[in-house]
């Protein structure tokens, strides 16, 4: 306890000097060794015993994580490291590598300024490595590289000294190629990783040693000595001479930015307010005396303290009893406690200044992505965009009717804790639908509802979430209000792919300045008139008001858009979410008396015009795809390719390395249920595989009627396919 207390004192002493702080994330593909690396960094800081490091998985504090051997949630910890005679505070977040939990990585990247990208020396860069690197660069988070499992390269692949260096060099080149391809401007500004400079370290997290060029100069240990130690399997001596925590933490302190250096560039990317305003200037210098600007990146439940909101404090200081505004809430919230994380433990402190990662209780209105501030009316931070979308859904029911009210509350809570989860109540069937990133994601959530929340549930087998879109143009189509006093005339057409890409990458939103948005839309191919007339963006769909001088339209527009968003959430063909739909309001006739153009009149008229127009414009379904990467011995290759091709999959590429073949393929998500067991059988358990979200592609016409009818029956709709006339006012 004494050691822990001493650590807290050191942490709080360093908190108030942003120059001595490094906020970092550890990111990688699944099983490349992130959590083992984190544990050894903690052991080096004296926070867990060296004997248990790498085996304790301190950062995987959840029972499910220990059982499955994977990281599911991001874990935070603050620790102290001495570099060149000075103490530094490292706020570290260990993130998941499994594609189903990629949302945690995205959110963690908003909280940190630098990332240690971990790569397995044998496997090299894998799909999730690319995804997390792209996410880091998008959030202006600077990377350094740790090549792990170098001992495997030497002892399992039996490479010699020279070949080892060639292979490691190729790996570094590949990472730099990725960085350059994703953000050339940053690459040219010095964000490439370079072993000679010191932004790359090599080692073994499991055996607790690491080496880098600065470390070699410091210790006098050469590459050939490292090779010999590994050959002789004398990892203990290597760990004594070149302790992992020293090489990696030195690299973090020297090459990753402090909050002061980082926030100058980062604030512009994640906040669209006026940078010359008081709060804009305070955030760019991490001013602890300024107004509070705190972004929530994670919400978890504490059995004693309730909801804990964790996030990054960009300016001001947080302390107990403070009244703050939460974006989207009408009343202020009172902070009850502030603290820092030590793995599973949250330690209370009196106050936390700007530049730190803080854990706060009492923010009852907070949600992931919320802006918390002492400044009323502050422009909120840019919302957090996730790389993948929820593509698998299950229906959830309480086993016992008495638990139904509790289940409703629990589902609200888990959706708040994990924003990549979408919870909806199916009005027709009364079922609660839970949509997530994949089978494993939903399995883990269902297990937690039972284990942590104490509600017994039953779930249906997983189903795929499709997308509705249109391939043609239709309109103007008239929509009449039930009282016949209001009429709307709309045209629908496919939204330009370039505009969809801008929306998907979060490069345009209705919150950005109009002139900036208009310029971006025109550059993406819209004419000036359309670029000026966009009035709403919902998911990857857009609504344009092309009318001129219509009386009462302004005060009715909110209701018209409500009709639009209702259709985009549940399209006319099968009540699946819509994507890539462009709706243009060409004309409108409105009753002069506001009583006759209320929500019950305007919303149905707006909705039905769009529904009918979409069915006239060849409404169709797109299905989600995943890329599937398989590593398999050559003699098992046939079984693996057959398994993919038997699931409507296609082989994109095949490469061989030694006696191993790497297969890159893609297949529809609907065909990949049960793939884990089948690929094991097909390859005698010798295949290693991973997946990555690959977007949506048209559902083959041969399957369309069967799939649409199946979805409609499941949702309690008429099995017969709808016609435009069904939605047109008589």
Curated annotation (Swiss-Prot):
Residues the entry annotates as binding GTP: 28-35, 94-98, 148-151
Family matches, as Pfam families: EFG_C, EFG_III, EFG_IV, GTP_EFTU, GTP_EFTU_D2
GO CC aspect terms: cytosol; ribonucleoprotein complex
Keyword Cytoplasm assigned: yes
Location relative to the cell: Cytoplasm
Domain of life per record: Archaea
PANTHER family associated with the record: ELONGATION FACTOR-LIKE GTPASE 1 (PTHR42908:SF3), TRANSLATION ELONGATION FACTOR-RELATED (PTHR42908)
Family: Belongs to the TRAFAC class translation factor GTPase superfamily. Classic translation factor GTPase family. EF-G/EF-2 subfamily.
Protein name: Elongation factor 2
Source species: Methanococcoides burtonii (strain DSM 6242 / NBRC 107633 / OCM 468 / ACE-M)
